[in-house]
């Protein structure tokens, strides 16, 4: 008996689970093309990256500094990232070069958000 393929949400078919996180997301280019800080909104976060919406943006492969708030600390998180995807105004950033403390903070954030789902 053939079964039709079930639709699986893109949030489920990822290397890391995604968790909804709505907060201000600030990004600035690293390197030669400085445009200042761009402000957007985050959509979701995982241990590997964060997705957000911006009215203007970057090409895939662009290195950026990301700054955003998380529910497990009172100070903003600042992490280096790379644009891995974008569709219209939505951008996917992969975290790169995480220090152990940053990695633990993102992991703790994801564990906390998982409990809130």
Language-model features, listed with the residues they occupy:
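A residue-level detector for short acidic-glycine micro-motifs
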Residues: 27, 44, 83-87, 97
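Short solvent-exposed strand/turn elements
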Residues: 58-60, 93-112
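Residue-level preference for beta-strand/loop junctions
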Residues: 17-19, 34, 60-62, 75, ...
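Short, surface-exposed secondary-structure edge patches
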Residues: 16, 53-58
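Short beta-strand-centered aromatic/proline hotspots
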Residues: 38-40, 77-84
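Short, solvent-exposed secondary-structure boundary/capping segments
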Residues: 50-54, 89-97
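N-terminal helix initiation/capping motif
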Residues: 1-45, 111-117
